[in-house]
Structures are given as C-alpha cells and as structure tokens.
Regions:
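Alpha-helical transmembrane segments in inner-membrane proteins
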Residues: 1-344
Length: 344
C-alpha cells in the first residue's frame, strides 16, 4: 500500500471538510428543487415534489420529463467537469489546468461538430466515445508540446493554440454542412442544458460515474504527484502511468460532458479552487468528493441564473460560466505572479 502523507497547506480538522461537503450537498439539493420550480409555468416546491411522486399529476410532464432530467444532467456534468479539473491540476501540478485550457474539450467538440454538421447519424450512446478520441488526441498533443515545463503561462499558451486549431477545424466542418445542421451546431457550441432529456442523462451518467470511480481509486497516487515526481517515485508511485491515467480520466469526463451538453468552460477550473479554499486543504483525497459536489452545484446554479437573467429569453449556460470564469482565471493568474522586489 502506498502511504501518502497529508500534504495540506494548512492543517485543518477533517471534520471541516465533511461539514463543508454536507453544506454544499444541501445547497445543490436546493438548486435542484429550484430548477424543478422555475419555468413556464412556475410551481411551488410542494407542487414540484408532488409532480415527481404522483404519475397522474397535471404538471408531471413539465416537471419530470423536462426540468428534472435537465437539472440532474447539470449535477452529473458539473461533477464530471469539476473532478476533471482536479485531476489535471494535481497530476500536472498546475493550478490553472483544465479541459478547456488544455484543448481537451476542444478536441471533443471537433468530433461532435463533425457528427452534427455532416449528419453522420451516430447513435447518442456512441458519441461520447468518439468525442473521447478527439479529446485524447488534443490532450496528448498539448502534453507533448508542454514537455516537462510546469509554467502556467506556457501551459495556457499551448492550450490556447490547440483550442484555436480545433476552432479552425470546426469552421472548416461548418463549410461542409447544410443551413439546418449549422444552426444546430451553433446552438451546441454555446454549451447548454436546454432540450436535454432522459436519453442524454442515461448516456452521460454511467460514463461520469466510471470516471469518478477511477479518480477515487487513483486519489492517493495523484496526491503523491503534487509532492513532486521524485518524492512520488520514492513513495512507490508509478509517476508516468499515474499521470497518463489521470489525464485519460479527465479526457473521458470532459468528452462525455461535451458530447451531451457542448463545451462548458471554467467549471473544471473553479470547482477545485473553491473546494480547497473552503476546506483549507490541498489534499486530493480529502477534497475529491467536495469538488464533485461543487462542480454540480456551480453548473446547476449557473443554469438557473442563465434561465432567469434575461427572462423570457434563455441564455446558454456556457455563456454564463464564461462570464464568471474569465475574471476568475485572470485573478488566479494575477495572484501567482511574484511581486517585484523593493530596492533602495
């Protein structure tokens, strides 16, 4: 067994992590209930719960067939994105690593765009696995270009280059499609939970569940990587295999979400940072459950805000997360820049 010492920056009681996780879970449940209540028509919490439990309830179609799968998909997709961000940040020892910044999400998007625009008729259940191929290819190219450097600025530049290249491929694919397919693709590229039903949830949930289980099994080895490659190797951790497995799991999670919801940025970046700040620990194994809950909470809350901000017009959730995520990324980058020395 690999014994990993607690690598928290600050020593805090484990009970704080449990307490914060329980509180975040309660907030996520509240957002789920709010998602069932809001819409046209709006209903109260009691009526929403009655519609879920009563097959004959007049609002059952609106609540159970439209709102419930959308909200549950938000929780599942957010959890997958959050854990994908945690895996990449800890395995690469880079606090601003994420599927959207390493080109992983863009690689998956290219594959799904080709399926949509070219009308290939690929079954929904198969699309995440094809998207995984694009995600793994893009991620592998970025990792090869990064090499051994851990400089966040260099990683962001390489990831931005890969995202730009994938964006160019999407534009090229658009030129081959019909007007109707291009409209569908445009809506997909904005990132949204709208018009998603039980088939989308049934496709994504098992894949995300498998990815979360894999992350849980690797949590101690990934935490060892945060101590440095030499220390991790000294603890008996196969460094290269663990890092490859972590990136592969992150690509799997990001590809599944991208196939069902489109590219949704910055949930993967923010969820791990919020979890670490709330608990006061950087321990991978301690914050992993909280990161999953925080990711789901962020995405469902963002979707609620997107639905109500410009009501009755609905903003795609991908735009809402970007509006919050870009300033957060700039803030994180600014905090990491060393202050100039004072002389004289």
């Amino acid at each position: 067994m690999i014994i990993i010492p607690d690598c928290s920056v600050r020593s805090r009681p484990h009970s704080r992590t449990v307490l914060v996780t329980v509180a975040a879970t309660a907030l996520a449940a509240g957002c789920l209930l709010a998602a069932l209540c809001l819409g046209q028509p709006s209903v109260g919490p009691a009526a929403a719960l009655a519609a879920v439990t009563d097959p004959e309830h007049p609002l059952r179609v609106a609540v159970v067939e439209v709102r419930l799968p959308r909200a549950l998909l938000g929780l599942v997709a957010g959890a997958g994105l959050g854990v994908a961000g945690l895996l990449l940040q800890d395995a690469l020892r880079n606090p601003i690593a994420g599927p959207e910044l390493l080109g992983v999400s863009s690689g998956a998007t290219v594959v799904v765009a080709a399926i949509v625009v070219l009308g290939l008729g690929v079954p929904l259940a198969l699309q995440p696995w094809l998207a995984l191929g694009g995600a793994l290819l893009a991620g592998a190219l970025v990792l090869l270009a990064i090499g051994r450097t851990r400089d966040p600025a260099h990683v962001v530049l390489v990831g931005a280059a890969m995202s730009a290249a994938c964006g160019g491929l999407v534009v090229a694919v658009v030129g081959l499609g019909t007007q109707g397919n291009v409209v569908v693709l445009f809506r997909y590229l904005l990132g949204s939970l709208a018009a998603r039903g039980w088939p989308h949830l049934e496709t994504v949930a098992p894949i995300v569940g498998a990815g979360l289980a894999g992350a849980w099994l690797l949590r101690r080895r990934i935490e060892a990587l945060t101590l440095g490659d030499e220390v991790a190797a000294g603890l008996g951790v196969p460094v290269v295999r663990t890092r490859v497995a972590a990136v592969g799991l992150a690509a799997l999670l990001a590809a599944a979400v991208a196939a069902a919801c489109g590219p949704i940025a910055f949930v993967a970046l923010l969820a791990p940072h919020l979890a670490r700040r709330a608990t006061g620990t950087t321990s991978t194994r301690r914050v992993l459950p909280l990161v999953a809950v925080a990711g789901g909470l962020l995405l469902v809350a963002a979707d609620l805000a997107a639905r109500r901000l410009l009501y009755p017009v609905e903003m795609p959730v991908g735009i809402a997360t970007t509006l919050v995520g870009v300033p957060a990324l700039l803030l994180l980058r600014r905090r990491r820049q060393p202050r100039p020395a004072v002389t004289g």
